[in-house]
Design a protein with these regions (language model features):
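Short alpha-helical scaffolding segments that buttress acidic/His motifs in well-ordered protein cores
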Residues: 105-109, 123-127, 173, 177, ...
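Hydrophobic alpha-helical connector segments
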Residues: 79-119
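Helix-turn-helix
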Residues: 26, 33-61, 65
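An amphipathic alpha-helix adjacent to DNA-recognition modules
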Residues: 16-21, 33, 56-83
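N-terminal intrinsically disordered/low-complexity leader segments
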Residues: 1-14, 85-86, 223-233
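C-terminal peripheral helix-coil segments that are non-catalytic and often amphipathic
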Residues: 144-233
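Amphipathic alpha-helical packing segments from all-alpha helical-bundle domains
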Residues: 100, 118-121, 131-158, 167
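Short hydrophobic clusters on alpha-helical segments that form packing/core surfaces
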Residues: 19-27, 211
Length: 233
């Protein structure tokens, strides 16, 4: 019996989806540069070793497809959190505090731990490799609309940071969060955990507090608190 054009297209979409899922896992485990498209095809159980190139044109297209599949969910969640933060602040007749904006940035990523999968690990690999491959710098979650919007709001709440300093801290924030989440996710997935790994709620709150501290820390020696350990008297 001949297959219909609709059936062929559906099969093609299913194959492409399998390739994307396999690539996300392999890239999260080993890094984008270390994985070949042939390995992706094999992991997707495809006998066609060129299937990734056929559907996505190459590794860059495949990475973009992973982001296109995952980023909209994070984008919508972050937009919802921003709206809620704005509503709370409007009721108090004040701007959204910088602390709340930092949380809006990263809570959707933290929630990925509840969904399983490998996207946070994938983002951690992208963050680590972005300086070696120029096109990678445009592909992580920071390219989504809600991330840019919240980042712009946060920059205005932190006038003590010039543009360069703000971008540097934001990049450090992304690396800290996705790297820590990837390590936590791997530890939880192993079933054995890690030495000293506490409850998820404590982990989440500690990560949020660390993120807020990173973005809101004062700059320059004149702004250091002399009571802090390790600072000159």
């Amino acid at each position: 019996m001949a297959r219909t054009g609709g059936g062929t297209r559906a099969d093609g979409r299913a194959t492409a989806e399998q390739v994307v899922m396999a690539a996300e896992r392999l890239f999260a485990e080993r890094g984008v540069e270390a994985v070949s498209l042939r390995e992706v095809a094999k992991a997707a159980t495809s006998r066609n070793t060129g299937v990734a190139h056929y559907h996505f044109g190459g590794k860059e297209g495949l990475v973009r497809a992973i982001v296109a599949r995952r980023a909209p969910v994070l984008n919508c969640r972050r937009a919802a959190l921003l709206e809620a933060a704005r509503n709370r602040s409007a009721a108090l007749a004040r701007p959204v505090p910088a602390e709340d904006l930092v949380r809006v940035l990263i809570v959707p990523l933290i929630e990925e731990l509840d969904h399983g999968g490998h996207y946070v690990g994938f983002l951690a690999r992208l963050a680590a490799e972005r300086h070696r491959a120029p096109w990678v710098a445009e592909l992580d979650d920071s390219s989504t609309a809600s991330f840019r919007e919240v980042s712009a709001l946060l920059a205005r709440r932190l006038p003590g940071l010039d543009r360069r300093r703000f971008r540097h801290r934001r990049d450090l924030l992304v690396q800290l969060v996705v790297g820590t989440l990837a390590a936590r996710g791997n530890a939880e997935a192993s079933g054995s955990g890690a030495p000293g790994m506490g409850p998820r709620a404590d982990f989440t709150e500690d990560l949020l507090e660390a993120a807020v501290g990173l973005m809101l820390a004062p700059t320059g020696p004149d702004n250091r608190d002399p009571r802090r350990p390790g600072q000159p008297k």
